[in-house]
Structures are given as C-alpha cells and as structure tokens.
A protein has these predicted regions:
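Iron-sulfur (Fe-S) cluster-binding modules
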Residues: 1-78, 89, 94-97, 105, ...
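Short glycine-rich anion-binding loops that position phosphate/pyrophosphate groups of nucleotides
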Residues: 78, 119-121, 147-149, 179
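Short acidic low-complexity segments
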Residues: 101-110
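Mid-length scaffold segments of soluble, non-membrane domains
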Residues: 110-131
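Short glycine-/acidic-enriched loop or helix-start segments at secondary-structure transitions
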Residues: 125-127, 152-154, 184-185
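A short, gly/pro- and small-residue-rich
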Residues: 127-143
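Catalytic nucleophile loop
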Residues: 139-150, 177
C-alpha cells in the first residue's frame, strides 16, 4: 500500500504506454512510490534581532567615521556569482540594509567602500585597480568570500592572477563560500571599526 493505494494502481496507467520499458524502471518506480517524503526542517540562520543590532552598529560607525551613510560599490573580480547573490540579498525586504544607511552605488566615485568578490582574473585586474583609484578616501576594501581571500577552487587557473590582496590593499576579509548576508554585514562593521 502506498498512500492508501496499491502500487499497482499507480503503475497500471504506465503499462502499455512504453513509459516503463524495463524491470529496472519498474523497480525504481516502486521504490520512489514507497519512499516517504524526506525533508529537513527549515532553519533560520539569522535572527531578525541580530541583523537589527549589526545594522544599527553599522549606521552608528558610519556616522562616526564618515559623518554620513555608507556608500558601497560591489566589484566582481571573477567569481562564480555565489557571493553576489548573498550581497544582493542584503537589499531584499528581509535585510533591507537601506534602513541602516547602507547604499549600493553604481560608480566608485560615489563609494566609500568596495566589496570585492572572486579571485582576480587577468581581465579584471586593471578594472579593479582603476576602481580602487577612483574611490575617494578612506577607500575601505572588503574581500568577500573564500575566492577573494585565497582564490578558492580557482587557485592555479590560467586566467587567475591571485587574491584581491595581490591587486589592491584589503582592510577586512569575510570568509565563507559564500558568506551569509549577516556575515557580510559583520565584515562591513569590522571594516568601519578599523577605520574609526
């Protein structure tokens, strides 16, 4: 019996249609039908209170160090985009970092902080240097993710020059593959504290 029905009742419509050609397929279908639903419970990795505390601290430190809100430019130096997804999540309604005065900007000329992801590839070394040079002081640079720190799985690849620190000075590293949005926020806070 499967779900209150005999397995034959589930399999019967498939017979004669060519859908179940071999006994292996038959056995697989029976196994699928006998296996109960297996899921892991939803675990909330971060609490709203922790995000709120870190966000308020970032806002206070930004006011202390810069006298205004923090403006961030994200730079993908050659990543797989896993870290970018976590950084982009900072703007979703759950984190909503705009309420803490964190603003993502399109131009490095308007940025106080660079979030750099991925190992630096040959094609991105010069653009990364120019982005760093265009950023006004205090030029806070945060290497986000394992690949930005030590090239991760891309280490030794032909197109990879090295970690972010080989191209521009790095103030803070944020470990993880990818790091969670809360970990990224903690890294931003640590960077502001080092400049304060």
């Amino acid at each position: 019996m499967i779900g209150g029905r005999d397995a034959a009742a589930w399999i019967q419509p498939c017979l004669g249609t060519g859908a179940l050609e071999t006994t292996v397929e038959m056995m697989l279908l029976k196994k699928i039908l006998r296996t109960p639903v297996v899921t892991e419970p939803l675990v909330r990795a971060e609490s709203e209170e922790q995000v709120e505390v870190i966000g308020r601290q970032i806002d206070a430190w930004a006011q202390r160090v810069l006298g205004r809100s923090l403006h961030i430019r994200e730079v993908d130096a050659g990543s797989c985009n896993g870290c970018e997804l976590e950084i982009i999540a900072l703007n979703n309604p759950y984190y909503d970092v705009e309420r803490f005065g964190l603003h993502f900007v399109a131009s490095p000329r308007h940025a106080d902080c660079l979030l750099v992801t991925g190992p630096v590839t040959r094609n991105m070394a010069d653009p990364l240097r120019r982005t760093y040079d265009a950023t006004p002081e205090p030029k806070i640079v945060i290497a986000i993710g394992d690949c930005a720190i030590d090239c991760g799985v891309f280490a030794g690849g032909y197109g990879v020059i090295g970690p972010v620190s080989a191209v521009v000075p790095v103030d803070v590293i944020v470990r993880g593959c990818p790091p969670t949005p809360q970990t990224v926020l903690a890294g931003i806070l640590a960077a502001l504290q080092t400049h304060g």
